[in-house]
């Protein structure tokens, strides 16, 4: 399955080609087509509208981090973060990663996770649900975060339907979406898809 998705950069090493895997959002789309729910960079779903339960609406939220935000914010030296990095190294080695470079690759991925956590809202900031209801069109989201092709990405996730730039999306964390643009711009694709 990993090979079908274009390979894992930390296993493929210098043989990894971006055009086989694509960007984070293209990989996310491929994973969704396989029945998985990839929400490691953003969480896109269709759910009941919180203000009108008779309607369904596309929802865009910050990701479910694989590790607790509080632990990630303490950096790579936190015991849980070290354990997660060791686990990632062990899996990559079992799949054939280069022993000399895998640690550096994992460090970059963990640093990305830490930076991603730093732009998410805390649990306390998310307690006021009225602040989590920010209807925007896909075109407006694209202005907040212009480097991600939001219309193409959202359409790739929707089975059997297509939307346009005027489609209303409930954005739960607009600040996150905006800050994500800068983070993705500074992070190599091979780190984003790892």
Predicted segments — roles?
Residues 1-194:
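Noncatalytic, helix-rich "gating/capping" subdomain that lines the substrate-entry/channel surface
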């Amino acid at each position: 399955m990993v090979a079908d998705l274009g390979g894992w950069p930390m296993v493929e090493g210098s043989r990894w080609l971006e055009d086989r895997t694509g960007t984070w959002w293209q990989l996310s789309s491929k994973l969704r087509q396989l029945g998985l729910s990839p929400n490691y960079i953003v969480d896109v779903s269709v759910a009941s509208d919180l203000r009108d339960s008779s309607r369904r609406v596309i929802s865009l939220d910050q990701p479910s981090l694989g590790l607790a935000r509080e632990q990630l914010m303490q950096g790579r030296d936190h015991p849980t973060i070290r354990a997660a990095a060791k686990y990632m190294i062990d899996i990559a080695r079992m799949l054939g990663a280069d022993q000399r470079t895998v640690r550096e690759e994992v460090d970059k991925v963990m640093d990305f996770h830490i930076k991603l956590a730093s732009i998410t809202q805390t649990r306390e900031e998310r307690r006021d649900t009225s602040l989590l209801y920010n209807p925007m069109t896909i075109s407006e989201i694209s202005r907040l975060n212009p480097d991600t092709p939001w219309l193409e990405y959202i359409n790739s996730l929707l089975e059997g339907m297509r939307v346009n730039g005027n489609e209303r999306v409930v954005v739960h964390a607009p600040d996150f979406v905006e800050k994500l643009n800068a983070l993705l711009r500074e992070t190599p694709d091979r780190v984003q898809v790892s």
